[in-house]
UniProtKB/Swiss-Prot annotation:
Belongs to the DXR family. It comes from Thermotoga neapolitana (strain ATCC 49049 / DSM 4359 / NBRC 107923 / NS-E). Keywords: Isoprene biosynthesis, Manganese, Metal-binding, NADP, Oxidoreductase. Mn(2+) binds at D141, E143, E208. Its EC number is 1.1.1.267. It is an enzyme of class 1 (oxidoreductase). GO terms for molecular function: 1-deoxy-D-xylulose-5-phosphate reductoisomerase activity; manganese ion binding; NADPH binding. This is 1-deoxy-D-xylulose 5-phosphate reductoisomerase. Pathway: Isoprenoid biosynthesis; isopentenyl diphosphate biosynthesis via DXP pathway; isopentenyl diphosphate from 1-deoxy-D-xylulose 5-phosphate: step 1/6. It catalyses: 2-C-methyl-D-erythritol 4-phosphate + NADP(+) = 1-deoxy-D-xylulose 5-phosphate + NADPH + H(+). Catalyzes the NADPH-dependent rearrangement and reduction of 1-deoxy-D-xylulose-5-phosphate (DXP) to 2-C-methyl-D-erythritol 4-phosphate (MEP). Coiled coil: none annotated. Its cofactor is Mg(2+); Mn(2+). NADPH binds at T12, G13, S14, I15, N39, N115, E117, G192.
Length: 375
């Protein structure tokens, strides 16, 4: 069987390194290019182990190795154009992933999407590119991977599951003052810091609802979210005739990663026992997760969705640095949305980036104000 070529963008992050774990277990895929931001030592180890020949460095760091090193403002696009890989795993986190996704769609045959912000902020740009190019877009998020596997043309509703985050059992009055150490103890998954905080606020699940609208072309009303404590059911499809499809698996991101790489085939990663299974589904409490319910305000506006993401980036960073309390995160987002509301809808990438930059500035001012009154 002919080897397929793979580029991993954001290789040193959580999804990137777990993709490498999958590559160690499967055959038929050769890693030809990577990008990373600042983790030089890990990048060097990856280049050596996988004999990577092309590296994009997006951070302001010095990097020397046996591979060709691409630098500069268009390095990622230039490498992608030169390699034209069969598969690109977009594991870049944050808003910068939007440019990475568009470059991957332009130059790859399949894009494995692990970046939420690209669809939240630039879904219209992604769908525009998909119409222009003959390229597959396969979701990597466990919830969207699950729905992708069982969805049918006619669905009554889909259900995305949520763990509820580290504070799901805390008294409501104590949540306000939770510390980063409290929040980073996720009950199910092992993830990066920002996404773990976003899980506790359920901003992450708000992103995933918006992603599902884009990926599956579903109206907001057909997407539901339930708290599922066991972390075993990742997606549910409810059909008009009363049938319900669910995807069960251990909470291991290597499962959806491998599926996105090998689709429609599957990797042999292990078995799953049904003997001791217990599952539960609970509604989302608006008092516990106020940021999640901002979805109703932002769902139909890419400008507000972009501002929502920008404000969350700023607020989570401030929380992790001890500048604001946990309860301040949703307040930063709310006040930023108030100031962005009424902005014209973006029509291209540059306008999305302008809104994101402006929203970040607003959120930073709100954060400074909150910090000053709480200190």
């Amino acid at each position: 069987m002919e080897e397929r070529t793979l580029v991993i963008l954001g290789v040193t992050g959580s999804i990137g390194t777990q993709t490498l774990d999958v590559l160690r277990k499967i055959e038929g895929i050769r890693l030809v290019g990577i990008s990373f931001h600042t983790n030089v030592e890990l990048a060097k180890k990856i280049v050596k182990e996988f004999q990577v020949e092309n590296v994009v460095v997006t951070g302001d760091v010095s990097f020397e190795c046996s591979a060709k090193v691409w630098k500069g403002p268009h390095a990622l696009e230039d490498m992608m154009e030169a390699l034209k890989p069969d598969i690109t795993m977009v594991a870049v986190s944050g808003f910068s992933g939007l440019r990475a996704v568009l470059a991957a769609l332009e130059h790859s045959r399949r894009v494995c999407l692990a970046n939420k912000e690209s669809l939240v902020c630039g879904g219209f740009l992604v769908k525009r590119k998909l119409k222009e190019k003959s390229v597959e877009l396969i979701p990597v998020d466990s919830e969207h991977s699950a729905i992708f596997q069982v969805i049918e043309p006619d669905v009554q509703k889909i259900v995305l599951t949520a763990s509820g985050g580290a504070l799901r059992d805390w008294d409501l009055e104590k949540i306000e003052t939770a510390t980063p150490n409290d929040v980073l103890k996720h009950p199910v998954w092992s993830m990066g810091a920002r996404i773990t905080v976003d899980s506790a606020t359920m901003v992450n699940k708000a992103f995933e609802v918006l992603e599902a609208m884009e990926l599956f072309d579903l109206p907001f009303e057909k997407i539901d979210v339930k708290i599922h404590r066991e972390g075993l059911v990742h997606g549910v499809v409810i059909l008009p005739d009363g049938n319900v499809k669910m995807v069960f698996s251990p909470p291991d991101m290597r499962i959806p990663i491998s599926y996105s790489l090998l689709y429609p085939k599957r990797a042999a990663l292990g078995s799953f026992s049904l003997e001791t299974m217990k599952i539960s589904f609970d509604p989302v409490n608006p008092e516990r997760y106020p940021a999640f319910f901002l979805l109703n305000q932002i769902k139909d506006s890419y400008a507000l969705r972009t501002a929502f993401n920008a404000a969350d980036e700023v607020a989570v960073d401030a929380f992790l640095k001890g500048k604001i309390k946990f309860g301040g995160i949703h307040r930063v987002i709310e006040r930023t949305l108030e100031r962005i509301d009424g902005y014209p809808e973006p029509e291209n990438l540059e306008e999305v980036e302008q809104i994101h930059d402006e929203a970040r500035k607003i959120a930073e001012r709100v954060t400074e104000w909150l910090s000053s009154i709480s200190s």
